[in-house]
Amino acid sequence: MLACIACSTKDGGEGGHRSATATPNSGKSLTSQLKDMVLKFSGSGRHQYKSGGSPSLRTSRFHRSSRLAAYPGIIDESGFTSDGAGEAYTYMRTTTASAGARAAPSTWDLPPKVNHRSFQPRVIRSPSASGVPSIGEEDYDDDDDDDDEETVLLEEDRVPREWTAQVEPGVQITFVSIPGGAGNDLKRIRFSREMFNKWEAQRWWGENYDRVVELYNVQTFSRQQGFSTPTSSVDEAMQRDSFYSRVGSTRESPAMMMPPPPPLPSSGAGREHPISRTASSKAQLSSSSSVAAARPPFYPSTAVPDPSDHVWAHHFNLLNSAAAGPAAPYDPSRGTTSSRDEASVSISNASDLEATEWVEQDEPGVSITIREFGDGTRELRRVRFSRERFGEERAKVWWEQNRDRIHAQYL
């Protein structure tokens, strides 16, 4: 029994020794096999990377190039191509649209799209770019960019744009484009002092009004009419002389259109006529005759009126009408054509021949023009302020403070 155990132990020990001696050789062979396998797998991976590249790498590279496609002056990777034979990528700076279109499907291996439109490369230029075009990669990216561009253009169309045109030497007209492309809004006219004086400027505007309206598609006049002071200190006086608006258009002055025929007495009561100055007070006929004899006679003016009167005529019309109270009954025998500037006399009846007009200097820099009719009715024709002493705002304040006194003293 003991002998058998000893034999088995001896045999086991010998076997263990043999296995121990054989283990280093087998370990070496296993290590070398594993190393060979690792080398084989690593070599095949490098070859596969050179030939095709992994999908995840292609995806990340594609997104990075998509983000940088809008900045061609910095980095432009959208034009490089691969020969597919394991060589390095070629960096192309001079890429044409046709070459990019042929290289894009083979480079990116994009899946076919369901839409019916073919791939159309689009050249994208950045204002800060160096002039090298970059080609858009995907169709839906181009669609998104086009939608963004169309939205920006629509936003620009909704904003009124101010622009200036030089009609002829010495004449500049400022327009404001009406949103929607409906036309232009006439805002300001500037005349050169070296080529035009006040009278020539107004005469030019009266002669060329229709041509300017037709040529520049003028639909409306600027709503900024009235008494806004120009911002330029150099052209301040010229701005005030040549600032024409709907209130003071020369086209509506008596010098530019014929007066209408006198109304009939039967239809005079129901006749609607433009804004006219109303009589604020009446004097006795005898006293008015003596006053009229002391005044110098008025002579009709045939020259073009002062353009500066355009700004104030309508304003004084409204103030005079408000201060005069209820209007006097309309007398058909004294019907005249009324315009907003009324720089010349319009006569519709022989009774108006007896009217006289004179100028009173209320204070230095303030001249008041008064008209008196044969029946003693007076009206305030014009109040003129010197540009050396009064600005527009100061003139308005002065008139508000002295309006009642002027009416009581002169009318």
From Swiss-Prot:
Q: Where is the composition biased (Acidic residues)?
A: 136-149
What are the GO cellular component annotations? nucleus
Name of this protein = Protein Brevis radix-like 2
Indicate whether RNA-binding appears among the record's keywords: no
Which residues does the annotated region (Disordered) include? 10-31, 103-149, 245-294, 324-346
- Which key words are in the record? Nucleus, Repeat
Q: Where in the cell is it found?
A: Nucleus
Q: Where are stretches of biased composition, namely Low complexity?
A: 276-294
Q: Which Pfam families match?
A: BRX (PF08381)
What family, per the record? Belongs to the BRX family.
Q: Which gene encodes it?
A: BRXL2
Which stretches are tagged as biased composition: Polar residues? Answer: 20-31
Q: At the top level of its lineage, which domain of life is listed?
A: Eukaryota
Signal sequence interval, chain numbering: none
